[in-house]
Amino acid sequence: MRSHYCGELSEAHLDQSVTLCGWVNRRRDHGGVIFIDLRDREGLIQLVFDPEYSPESFRHAEQIRSEYVLQVKGRVQHRPEGTENPDLKTGQVEVLGQELILLNASETPPFPVDEKLEVGEDIRLRYRYIDLRRPESLQRLRFRSAIIRQLRKFLDERGFLDIDTPILTQSTPEGARDFLVPSRTHPGQFFALPQSPQLFKQLLMVAGVDRYYQVVRCFRDEDLRADRQPEFTQLDIEASFLHEETLMALMEEMFKELFATVLEVPLHTPFVRMPYAEALACFGLDKPDLRIPLRLVEVGDLMKTVDFKVFAQPAQDRDGRVAALRLPGGGKLSRKEIEEYTQFVAIYGAKGLAYIKVVERSRGREGLQSPILKFLPDEVIGAMLERTEAENGDIVFFGADKASIVNESLGALRVKLGHDHGLVEHGWSPLWVIDFPMFEWDEDDHRWHALHHPFTSPKEEDLSLLEQNPGACRSRAYDLVLNGTEVGGGSIRISQSQVQSQVFRLLGIGDEEAQDKFGFLLDALKYGCPPHGGIAFGLDRLVMLMTGSASIREVIPFPKTQTAACPLTGAPGQVAEAQLRELGIGVRRLASDKV
């Protein structure tokens, strides 16, 4: 139906006859000549309909409105001198219309496609097929496609096999809640949609596939949180006979090539390696943004004997922490601004936000401003200023509480201060976080949970700690963090059946339950399982970062809302009683439900 895309025409096509198809972006009537901007996936081209050149096509053009779908035949010509549009890829040429065919009319869309207006997300998602006509929305999908194409190319060239794994699988007791699918042929039993292909890709390693990858949909019925999707896309990777350093180096090469090809931006390798403990100590969280030149500083040892319980008690508590965060030039902050930051850290459980302003450091206590100075001896103040490297004009904030609260609150404050005060450096700052603990203790459940997942291998030198001191056992896990966002996580896996059973028992999964839920894996590990490991990257989040999008929903073709609903289709919805009876399911309806 067409010979060219609208957006690919240039002076190289002058005097050629072309056939174009697309949507009317805008129609203008200027002095008896009609101009139509025709839009397709590749861009815009200006069409000219002159009654003296083609009276019939001019009459048709008079009836055309925005978003009508057209087929147009015409001749490419230079735009008249002075009417060129340097902001448009096709701005040097136009098409003189010879024949116009209306392929389909359009009602007035719920929002304009051709204008950069702020449109509410609810209506954009409800009419997502209109929203995706907007150049910026369509460009994100093109970019997403380019990223996936480049990643596939890299892995294909290095011997990785693209292999599908099942979507209908077994529900497992670890991780987020599963989406369950009732089985009609096995009444009362359920499949689960996969949270990841984890177990199947490990079985592929047992099978001798050696190198596997897959661009795969994953499903997690998580509690509602901002910027989370119940279904998302992963680049899933697994390989045999390698150590973590080999895999990390390969992934660095993949990202370096991706950024060079798609963004034309260099990434310097090797990426920074940072132990988990260092990340928490210096940045308060396990996904630090290294573009922000602010660090947390431990001062608990200085505060153990001060006559100020707010500091002394957590400093003496085994699970407590007292940390400082210096903001260069922050001495100019007003009382109102400090109060706003105090309210901000309260979101993370902090009971307050102590501070000291450094006016003239050389004067000691007299050169400082703070309501807490009266509680601190001169030697503590001096040591704190020395350790934080505070200078005149700075402000030093303090967090004192359980270590988890201090880390989370000051870690979040560090990021906010960096953005509020223009301290975030431009560019890309990738790093690996390594040496994670194998387990974390759940105070509510009074049991251990796997920090990553139960199939992660402990470090060989820490194997004995599985029985002696699980909290001190480190894993062979690694997370890739990019500008403060975790984009991927992986590990070397457990390849011995007895170690896997030991980890299950430690997590409260008894032998009977382990056999019921994971028996196929435990059996497979007994049949010559190779050492293996892998990683999975969240493609949606990676595309969001690389496109500079504000939300993950911007880079997913048909996303769900924050309430895990689809405004476009109305999902989730009720189903007919006959379908439920066929599945052997009864539904207890709420009084508010529609019947």
UniProtKB/Swiss-Prot annotation:
Binding site for ATP: R220, D221, E222, Q229, E486, G538, L539, D540, R541
The keyword Amino-acid biosynthesis is assigned to this record: no
Residue span of region Aspartate: 198-201
Annotated site, Important for tRNA non-discrimination, chain positions: H30, G82
Classification via InterPro entries: Aa-tRNA-synt_II, aa-tRNA-synth_II, aa-tRNA-synth_II/BPL/LPL, Asp-tRNA-ligase_1, Asp-tRNA-ligase_1_N, Asp/Asn-tRNA-synth_IIb, AspRS_core, GAD-like_sf
Cellular compartments annotated: Cytoplasm
Catalytic reaction list: tRNA(Asx) + L-aspartate + ATP = L-aspartyl-tRNA(Asx) + AMP + diphosphate
Class in the EC hierarchy, top level: ligase
Amino-acid positions noted as binding L-aspartate in the UniProt annotation, renumbered to this chain: E174, R220, H452, R493
GO molecular function per UniProt: aspartate-tRNA ligase activity; aspartate-tRNA(Asn) ligase activity; ATP binding; nucleic acid binding
Keyword tags: Aminoacyl-tRNA synthetase, ATP-binding, Cytoplasm, Ligase, Nucleotide-binding, Protein biosynthesis
GO terms (BP aspect): aspartyl-tRNA aminoacylation
EC number(s) on file: 6.1.1.23
Disulfide cysteine pairs (residue numbers): none
Gene3D superfamilies in alphabetical order: Bira Bifunctional Protein, Domain 2, GAD-like domain, Nucleic acid-binding proteins
GO cellular component, one term: cytoplasm
Role this protein plays: Aspartyl-tRNA synthetase with relaxed tRNA specificity since it is able to aspartylate not only its cognate tRNA(Asp) but also tRNA(Asn). Reaction proceeds in two steps: L-aspartate is first activated by ATP to form Asp-AMP and then transferred to the acceptor end of tRNA(Asp/Asn).
HAMAP family membership: Asp_tRNA_synth_type1
Complex formation: Homodimer.
Family (UniProt): Belongs to the class-II aminoacyl-tRNA synthetase family. Type 1 subfamily.
PANTHER family (UniProt xref): ASPARTATE--TRNA LIGASE, MITOCHONDRIAL, ASPARTYL/LYSYL-TRNA SYNTHETASE
Name of the protein this chain belongs to: Aspartate--tRNA(Asp/Asn) ligase
Gene source species: Nitrosococcus oceani (strain ATCC 19707 / BCRC 17464 / JCM 30415 / NCIMB 11848 / C-107)
Top-level taxonomy: Bacteria, Pseudomonadati, Pseudomonadota, Gammaproteobacteria, Chromatiales
